Swiss-Prot record:
GO CC, alphabetical: ribonucleoprotein complex; ribosome
Gene coding for it: rplI
Keywords: Ribonucleoprotein, Ribosomal protein, RNA-binding, rRNA-binding
One term of GO molecular function: rRNA binding
Protein source organism: Thermosynechococcus vestitus (strain NIES-2133 / IAM M-273 / BP-1)
Keyword Zinc: no
Assigned protein family: Belongs to the bacterial ribosomal protein bL9 family.
Name assigned to this protein: Large ribosomal subunit protein bL9
Function: Binds to the 23S rRNA.
A biological process from GO: translation
Classification via InterPro entries: Ribosomal_bL9, Ribosomal_bL9/RNase_H1_N, Ribosomal_bL9_bac/chp, Ribosomal_bL9_C, Ribosomal_bL9_C_sf, Ribosomal_bL9_N, Ribosomal_bL9_N_sf
TM ranges: none
Length: 152
């Protein structure tokens, strides 16, 4: 009996590999766990060709997402500063703070671009002034924006 068998993963498995990856596992693990649950299949030539096609489609999808992110970056870099007006109390302190959602709403109002608030890195904004925000549009594409907070 073979010591190890090669399988193609149909799903990502912790501590084993990502979907589409060819890995070597014990024959019993493959036969009793991976194959019955549909997590993996034997590394046959047809399975390897199918995985290669899927990986090519994924590469194309990621390239398209990156080009969209580059276009968004160009649009956002045209904005010198985003101005957000907030109600102010004593000593130029804001009532509350400026949140990533406030910045995303301001960007959408100005440019029409939808930005995910979870992809923003903002300092704590509790006073009037100018701050710098970093927005991660794609793992390889980030943009820095100036945010000016003014009184209502």
């Amino acid at each position: 009996m073979a010591k190890r068998v090669q399988v193609v993963l149909n799903e990502t498995v912790n501590k084993l590999g990502r979907m589409g990856q060819v890995v070597e596992v014990a024959p019993g693990y493959a036969r009793n766990y991976l194959f019955p649950r549909g997590i993996a299949e034997p590394a046959t030539p047809s399975a390897l060709r199918r995985v290669e096609r899927l990986q090519e489609k994924e590469r194309q999808r990621l390239a398209a997402l990156k080009s969209i992110a580059e276009k968004q970056k160009a649009t956002l870099e045209k904005l010198a500063t985003i101005t957000i007006s907030m109600p102010v109390g004593e000593k130029d302190m804001l009532f509350g703070s400026v949140t990533p959602q406030d910045v995303a709403d301001a960007i959408q109002a100005i440019t029409g671009e939808t930005i995910d608030r979870r992809e923003m890195i903002l300092p704590e904004i509790r006073k009037l002034g100018t701050y710098t925000a970093e927005i991660k549009l794609h793992p390889e594409v980030t943009v820095k924006l100036n945010i000016q907070v003014v009184a209502d």
